[in-house]
Structure formats: structure tokens, C-alpha cells
Regions:
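Bacterial Sec-dependent N-terminal signal peptides
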Residues: 1-23
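Extended hydrophobic/Leu-rich segments
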Residues: 6, 346-347
Length: 348
């Protein structure tokens, strides 16, 4: 199915064919020059597609957004026919025909179910873990999925934390090696049977106080870099296509809007050049942390280094107005859009 959707995009739009024959940065430069501000912001917009799974594609608001270039990615759409139909809208009906990313949580297998990640880590069998990710990628890509929210490389020491089973335990060395293996398994050589990995949750999500999910984190920089950051650094160096920021606060600032975390460390120190997506609704949840209204949260998230908004609808609702008000520069929108386009076009 993935091959048929990609062939569809090539047949319908020579623009995407060019992406395979000229340097990606040149292609994206040309594409950005053709995009309106609203279309650029649309590429930063990730929305849920559960209504499509249970209903008709063309009756979903997502179809209208895709047709008007206001949508960059969708999560939780299941079914070959459903994904193909929405992808056809994006490549046939939108002005520029940019295809969509289709994301899914693929934690320990897709159709073939493997042991939970914590159990897999007990094996220390990196070859088997990589093979499991490769099988999951093959199965997911056959259904039209091209982006998976995995691996989760959060170091977790407190068994009270409810998501400890999704990670690799407390050892930063082992967690780093497993993250690398899963990225290799998922992404491979960017072929038809591969998917883009999304490393999560950056960062310190597994260190929530008292093991309470979403809770605050307060620790020294030394402990961060020695114990909690190594798997993320290893994943960045392994070429993971995307990172997902965490819900928790770091040094009193929500991770989604924390420039030190997202830019100073991930971008500048580790030289990561993939794109950053929020966790589900995280920009909207920043309001509860006292950052202001939804527009203020969007501006802070973008300034911090966030590239894609997952399901807050915050970028879509507020960034154009923020540009007009001088709160956000068009160059910031372009930078985020470029990151999303460069990585998504490789993996679609």
C-alpha cells in the first residue's frame, strides 16, 4: 500500500518526483518559496484521525484541511483504504500536493506482538530487538503508516511510574544501545518497508517526582547528562528522524517550551537536525503551567525549538496572528517547516 500511495504522488505531481532527483535542501527551498504562510503552518499541524477509522474519509474535517494544505500529519488512522483515500486528497486536491505523514504508536510490534520493551531489554539481545523493530516497520508500512512514535528511551528508576514498561529500564548504557538498534530496525535505508522513528519523551519524563505521570522534575544538570540524557544523545547520533518532547517541566519550564532543552542541548550541543513534535496536546497544556494563553504557549514552543504541534491545534489557530503581531518571525516558521518537509519527504 505504501508503494501505491507513493506512486500516486509521483504520478499526480511532478514536484515530488523532483525531490528524488535534486538535493533535498534545493528542493525544499523551491517548495518553501511557493508556499503561503498558511500552508507552511499547515505542515506543522498534526491531528488525530480516529473519526476516519470509524467513518467516511470525505466527511471528516481532515479531508478539507488536507485539500487546502492545512495539514501535515495525522495519527491513529487505521486501514489501508482509509489512509489511501486521505493521502489521495493531499496529493491530488491540495495546491502543492504535499503528501501526509501517518503516525502510529508502535511500541512492541504492529501486527506481530513482541514482549514489552522492558522485557526485551532484559535479554540484552540487540540483534533480536533490531529485528523486531524491522518486522514492525514492514507490517506498519504495508498498512500505509510511515511514522512511528517509538522508541521510548526514558530512563526510569521508580517502579511507581505507570509507563515504565514502555522503556528499557534504568541503565543508560543499555538504553542507548537499544534505542540505536530500534532506530536501525525502523528506519533501515529509508526504503519502502521502513518508517521514520520518533524518539520519546525528551526529556526526563521517567524521572517524574513520586512516579506520578506528568509530574515535575527537579534534578542537577550533572545527573541529567550522566544518567538521563545518554539514550537521547545516542538516538540523535543514530539519525532518528524525529524527537517527541515530554509533558513534564524541566527547571520549572515545560519541556515543550524549554529552549535550553530543545535548542541549546539537542540542536546546538548534539547537532540534531531532525524535527521535534510535541506530545499529545502539550502546547495547550502549557497554559496550565502559567505561560499565558494559547497564543503565548504557541509562541514559546516555537521559539524553544518545537516544529510540529500534536493535537493542540495551537499552531494552526495562533501562529499566523502571532506573525502579524510581530511575536514570531516568518523565518522561524520556515525553519520548522523545512525540518518537517526534509524528514517527511525522505520517509514517505
Amino acid at each position: 500500500m505504501k508503494k501505491s500511495v507513493f506512486s500516486l504522488s509521483l504520478a499526480c505531481l511532478s514536484l515530488l518526483a523532483t525531490a528524488r532527483t535534486e538535493p533535498m535542501n534545493t528542493f525544499v527551498d523551491n517548495l518553501l518559496s511557493k508556499m503561503t504562510l498558511e500552508e507552511k503552518i499547515g505542515q506543522l499541524n498534526l491531528l488525530p484521525g480516529g473519526d476516519i477509522t470509524t467513518g467516511a474519509v470525505m466527511k471528516s474535517p481532515l479531508a478539507d484541511l488536507a485539500a487546502n494544505g492545512r495539514l501535515g500529519a495525522v495519527l491513529n488512522v487505521k486501514g489501508v483504504d482509509k489512509i489511501r483515500a486521505l493521502q489521495e486528497v493531499a496529493v491530488k486536491k491540495s495546491r502543492l500536493g504535499i503528501p501526509l505523514l501517518f503516525g502510529q504508536d508502535v511500541i512492541h510490534g504492529y501486527q506481530t506482538v513482541f514482549p514489552i520493551p522492558l522485557a526485551q531489554s532484559c535479554s540484552w539481545d540487540l540483534e533480536a530487538i533490531e529485528q523486531g523493530a524491522r518486522i514492525a516497520a514492514r507490517e506498519a508500512s504495508a498498512q500505509g503508516i510511515n511514522w512511528v512514535y517509538s522508541p521510548m528511551v526514558d530512563i526510569a528508576l521508580d517502579p511507581r511510574w505507570g509507563r515504565i514498561a514502555e522503556g528499557n529500564g534504568e541503565d543508560p548504557f543499555l538504553g542507548s544501545r537499544i534505542g540505536e538498534a530500534m532506530i536501525r530496525g525502523f528506519q533501515g535505508n529509508y526504503g519502502r518497508e521502513n518508517v521514520m522513528a520518533c524518539v520519546k519523551h525528551y526529556a526526563l519524563y521517567g524521572a517524574a517526582e513520586a512516579g506520578r505521570d506528568y509530574n515535575t522534575v527537579d534534578m542537577s544538570r550533572q545527573r541529567m547528562f550522566n544518567q538521563y540524557f545518554p539514550p537521547f544523545k545516542a538516538a540523535a547520533e543514530a539519525g532518528a528522524g524525529s524527537f517527541m518532547s515530554s509533558f513534564n517541566v524541566v527547571d520549572g519550564i515545560p519541556a515543550t517550551g524549554n529552549r535550553w532543552l530543545l535548542t541549546d542541548v539537542l540542536r546546538d550541543r548534539w547537532h540534531y537536525d531532525g524535527f521535534l513534535v510535541t506530545d499529545y496536546g502539550a502546547i495547550g497544556e502549557m497554559v496550565a503551567h502559567g505561560v499565558g494563553d494559547l497564543k503565548a504557549a504557541s509562541v514559546q514552543a516555537l521559539h524553544a525549538g518545537t516544529d510540529m504541534d500534536m493535537c493542540s491545534d495551537a499552531f494552526a489557530k495562533t501562529l499566523a496572528e502571532a506573525v502579524k503581531a510581530g511575536k514570531v518571525g516568518v523565518e522561524e516558521i520556515d525553519r520548522a517547516c523545512r525540518r518537517v518537509l526534509e524528514l517527511s519527504l525522505i520517509h514517505i
